[in-house]
Amino acid sequence: GAAGNIGAETVANAAPDGYTLLESPDATFTINPLVYQKLNFKPESIVPLTALVTFSQMLVCHPSVPVKTVADLRAHAKARPLSYASGGVGSPGHLVMEMFLSATGVPMNHVPYKGPVPAAQDLLSGQVACAFLVTNAVAPHVKAGRLVGLAMSGRKRSNLVPEVPTMQEAGVPNYDATFSEMLYVPRGV
């Protein structure tokens, strides 16, 4: 809950005896301290043990948006500003999209949701035009034609949708937004 802050607080206050672990995205410690005015824990009281998985997000659009590539999206959105969904202000999907908009000069209206699931639901129903969402959640919808996959946020293509290029391959140089799911322990373990 609270973008990982509740779990992090629990681990920060736990005895460093090896019995308390935190599985959390790296965003809990890279983004949250910048977004939340008050954290009920000190990030330095928790240390990373290992990265469990590294992943990218996929830029996807509703099929009603007449785009098949990042170049199409750039041209279409400049002519007719679109809306994009995210899992909330400061969420990885929000920041990755803002990074894209900054790199390309594309104007879009942000529609923040209370988590990525309602954002994906409204994207699938066509209430918003596009979003950056976790690949394994949207890949089946891309394969079924319910969403159009435009680009991966990271440096590598996904094995789930190898036909979807990276953002760099799609013409956005130096773009890389990769995330990790981490295992953390209280300092002193």
Cite the ranges covered by each PLM segment.
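Adenylate-forming
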Residues: N5-A8, F29-L34, H94
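Short, charged, surface-exposed secondary-structure boundary motifs
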Residues: A119-D122, N159-E163
